[in-house]
Amino acid sequence: IMPTNSHNPEPLTTSNAAVVFVDNQVGLMTGIRDYSIAELKHNIVGLAKAARALDLPVVTTTTSSETLWGPAIPELQAALPGQSFIDRTTVNAWDDPRVEAAIRATGRNKLVFAGLSLEVCAAFPAMRAVREGFEAYVAVDACGTFDMTKRETGIVRLNQSGVVTVDASSLMIEILGDNASPKAPEVY
């Protein structure tokens, strides 16, 4: 049987993956309408804690935190103590040279994105990553947006652009690789 989708990348591992959190900010969170805020925050924090437990490089950004959208949500800051957030003004996080440099400095070729909003903050840099030769994944349950149409069309656009859409837990469990690992309880 021949697969209908020839895009079947090599598995994510602790040596090839990094996580990029884009604009998980207080002001943007208040407009989320496609997901329960409590569940969305749970998924964002779970992704952050799993990334830390697996020793994955993490890049975090905010946009216009002083003028438009406020700081990163406190729950994400607490899950990533000591993490610096790159505050920028560009719509596409990748267009800020500091963000691009931070992503490239991870040395990883598989990038997991989570952001508010899904169709802009997570999607734009993920699509750019694909164009730049990276494999990009969007953890759709760690992303939110402002209505269901934006969510549905955003996921379609991501898939059409070569970005893999999947849930955060599946990504981190794939990276974990072995339930006998002492890191397993922190990942699950």
Role assignments for model-derived ranges:
Residues 112-115, 134-148:
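A short glycine-rich beta-strand->turn/loop micro-motif centered on a GG-aromatic cluster
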